[in-house]
Amino acid sequence: MAENKFKTAVLATPDLVYNEGKGALSNQYKRKVEVADCQGSVDIDFCLKDKTVGKNQCRWDYAIGSNNQSYFVEIHSADTKNIDEVTKKADWLKRWLKISAQNLDEIKHLPFYWVATSGIDVRNRNKMAKLATLNVKLVSSPLVIKA
């Protein structure tokens, strides 16, 4: 049986709960992400909401395993007014990976994905450029992760 590096990394990370397949994604969001060879998922936001590392923070939503990599996915409305919030979440994610989730950091896939819950209406190029420097890519749904 092939090693599941995603599951190993999740289990080595404090406070996270591993889920089979897309089990960590809420039902309304499962159709927003298509994953070939899904190796599991984590609801980062839920797992860390009451923990010191995540309490009162803008937290990233999900980690999804595929191809022995961790894909980080934020499912959020995509209007110009949401850019600052997603930027804060991406900043938090990068810090958390370096400080508390090094095993996931080692297998992270870039870019981080911001998946629009519906249409995309973003009109501020400067703020989008800031997201690009954080390796965040805004995509319409569904996000397709290929094997």
Predicted regions and their residues:
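Mg2+/Mn2+-dependent nuclease catalytic core
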Residues: D79-W96
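Acidic-basic catalytic patches of nuclease active cores, encompassing PD-(D/E)XK
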Residues: M1-G54
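Domain-level recognition of nuclease-like catalytic cores that cleave nucleotide substrates
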Residues: E3-T8, E106-A147
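Short, flexible loop/turn motifs enriched in small residues
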Residues: K55-R59
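Arginine/glycine-rich "motif VI" loop of SF2 helicases in the C-terminal RecA-like domain
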Residues: R95-I107
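The feature represents the first ordered module of a protein
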Residues: G40-V42, G54, F72-I75, N82
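Conserved catalytic cores of phosphodiester-cleaving nucleases, focusing on short active-site segments
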Residues: Y62-I64, N68-D79
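Short acidic, S/G/P-rich loop/turn micro-motifs used as interaction or catalytic elements
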Residues: K51-G54, A78-N82, G119-R123
